[in-house]
Design a protein with these regions (language model features):
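PLP-dependent amino-acid enzyme catalytic core
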Residues: 1-247
Length: 247
């Protein structure tokens, strides 16, 4: 499975798309083709969160072996990273209604579901691509993504992360969570403006030939932990499938 930019015919490997986040032309990376065998909710019913994640990822991250994917999933979703080993506990209200608890991750936000796995996907992609530059993750947030991304990437070797948030656009708790984040490789910065302003600024950085050339001279590669990155998107799809599989 390869990925292509929405703005050109450029095709890249899943690892390349994971590392770069956004295509050089500003387009999003999307699957070159979609699998014909669509996942059936009936087939997923009763399976563990980890099994559902593997069922989704196996269609799109074919650059990794099944064993590699399962190891990453096991490292991301366990009773150390989540307070409940079911990851997303489901409670049936009646035959047609269930409640999914999305708050058992390290930051109490549902963003933990995707970002816990993204860390391992990005690290594996860096190794597979033989990328020797340090990764600098630049991420915009309106609150929950920032803390979850910081927590996921804290103290990861060869990776640094900087989160930008609107100074007046997050809750006091979210601001404290980000500002007090532990880790030697994490930074946060408040901006004047809203989330869209932060996101637009980062997209200009990602697509600036001059800025990227300067970063390359310093041995740095920019990446993103926002949903523009397939490593954030497909784990999110897996969490959606988990909730739907009980219907």
């Amino acid at each position: 499975m390869n990925f292509r930019s929405t703005r050109s015919d450029e095709c890249v490997s899943p690892s390349y798309a994971l590392l770069h986040g956004l295509a050089a032309d500003g387009g999003l990376y999307v699957p070159e083709s979609f699998p014909e065998n669509v996942l059936s909710y009936k087939d997923l019913a009763g399976k563990s969160y980890q099994d559902i994640a593997e069922a989704v990822l196996s269609h799109f991250f074919t650059n990794f072996t099944a064993e590699e994917r399962k190891q990453m999933i096991a490292s991301a979703y366990n009773d150390t990273t989540f307070r409940d080993d079911r990851i997303v506990p489901l409670h049936s209200i009646d035959t047609d209604l269930s409640i999914a608890e999305l708050f058992h991750g390290r930051t109490l936000a549902f963003k933990d579901l995707a970002l816990s796995l993204f860390t391992y996907l990005l690290t594996a992609a860096k190794k597979q691509e033989k990328e020797d530059r340090d990764i600098l993750i630049l991420t915009a947030t309106s609150g929950d993504t920032g803390k979850a991304a910081l927590e996921g990437f804290k103290d990861v070797p060869g990776t640094n992360i900087m989160v930008f948030y609107p100074s007046e656009g997050v809750s006091p708790m979210q601001k404290q969570q980000m500002q007090k984040q532990e880790g030697d490789n994490v930074k946060v910065s408040a901006i004047y403006g809203n989330f869209d302003d932060a996101q637009s600024f980062l997209k200009r950085v990602f697509t600036s030939a001059e800025v990227n050339a300067y970063a390359n001279e310093k041995g740095v590669l920019f990446s993103s932990a926002n949903s523009i990155n397939i490593g954030r998107l497909f784990p999110k799809v897996a969490s959606s499938q988990d909730r739907k599989s009980v219907v």
